[in-house]
Amino acid sequence: MGLFDRGVQMLLTTVGAFAAFSLMTIAVGTDYWLYSRGVCKTKSVSENETSKKNEEVMTHSGLWRTCCLEGNFKGLCKQIDHFPEDADYEADTAEYFLRAVRASSIFPILSVILLFMGGLCIAASEFYKTRHNIILSAGIFFVSAGLSNIIGIIVYISANAGDPSKSDSKKNSYSYGWSFYFGALSFIIAEMVGVLAVHMFIDRHKQLRATARATDYLQASAITRIPSYRYRYQRRSRSSSRSTEPSHSRDASPVGVKGFNTLPSTEISMYTLSRDPLKAATTPTATYNSDRDNSFLQVHNCIQKDSKDSLHANTANRRTTPV
């Protein structure tokens, strides 16, 4: 991708990280996750008696507190009691565990921490652009934060639907508030930012690999254009071709030809004669020697005469031999 595309992706990642962290922080810190009808209890102590006044009104609650919206105790907030004294948890251990997780709110808090760390990684990737693993770490943090967020939302819904202190009519008369939707929106944005950050890392990794391959190709082509390298390569190719070609020195000689009739042992082959080694070593070309040539001609003529005489004798013998 081009520089403009990378800039747009980085801008979207930064804005998304800030939005996801802000939405989740607001959702965890506010008390508008659920609207339902409940009882606001107050306890007043006088000199002689303790009076309790119970009133069923519309309430809004968050992860830790419940606040009254109407009645005499409008605006009054109290801590949520996830383990009331009149409830029996021995019969259902799963419900007790669910209430414990709901009371701790560990998953929403963990989501906020992971979103914060992912935002730090995105900010660090702007200053350390050569370290591409930072943006990958940011993507992993955001994906993990989204998963932790959705687990916390599921636990909250399950705990609210299975609350035994509420009657069936009260369980059906509730609605989720804007804090709940902020948390759900934070989950969606966190997952999108995580996927985008991982995509940016993969894109940058591909560009680095393509650049490295192009550099290696240019270096290799530059080496092949060096004259000394080409000369060594040509010499090596020539030597290898010479070693693979068959030798024709023996086949070209008259002695090695199949069916060649060699001269008799009494005759001297002209091919075996060589020049004088002393003269051949001292002079580049052989000089004419009349004495040696005359003796050579005399010897050659004698050999021819002897061969003719032996030939006539053999013919006479053949004629006189009775059949």
Swiss-Prot record:
InterPro entries with a match to the protein in the record: CACNG_subunit (IPR051072), PMP22/EMP/MP20/Claudin (IPR004031), VDCC_g2su (IPR005422), VDCC_gsu (IPR008368)
Record-linked Pfam families: PMP22_Claudin
Record's keyword terms, sorted: Calcium, Calcium channel, Calcium transport, Glycoprotein, Ion channel, Ion transport, Membrane, Phosphoprotein, Synapse, Synaptosome, Transmembrane, Transmembrane helix, Transport, Voltage-gated channel
Modified how: Phosphorylation of Thr-321 by PKA impairs interaction with DLG1 and DLG4.
Compartments, as annotated in UniProt: Membrane; Synapse, Synaptosome
Residues with PTM Phosphotyrosine: Y271
Modified residues (Phosphoserine): S253
GO biological process assignments: eye blink reflex; membrane depolarization; membrane hyperpolarization; nervous system process; neuromuscular junction development; neurotransmitter receptor localization to postsynaptic specialization membrane; positive regulation of protein localization to basolateral plasma membrane; postsynaptic neurotransmitter receptor diffusion trapping
Tissue-level expression: Brain.
Similarity comment: Belongs to the PMP-22/EMP/MP20 family. CACNG subfamily.
Biological function: Regulates the trafficking and gating properties of AMPA-selective glutamate receptors (AMPARs). Promotes their targeting to the cell membrane and synapses and modulates their gating properties by slowing their rates of activation, deactivation and desensitization. Does not show subunit-specific AMPA receptor regulation and regulates all AMPAR subunits. Thought to stabilize the calcium channel in an inactivated (closed) state.
Record text on subunit structure and interactions: The L-type calcium channel is composed of five subunits: alpha-1, alpha-2/delta, beta and gamma. Interacts with the PDZ domains of DLG4/PSD-95 and DLG1/SAP97. May interact with GOPC. Acts as an auxiliary subunit for AMPA-selective glutamate receptors (AMPARs). Found in a complex with GRIA1, GRIA2, GRIA3, GRIA4, CNIH2, CNIH3, CACNG3, CACNG4, CACNG5, CACNG7 and CACNG8. Interacts with GRIA1 and GRIA2. Interacts with MPP2.
Protein name: Voltage-dependent calcium channel gamma-2 subunit
Organism (species): Mus musculus
Taxon lineage: Eukaryota, Metazoa, Chordata, Craniata, Vertebrata
Gene: Cacng2
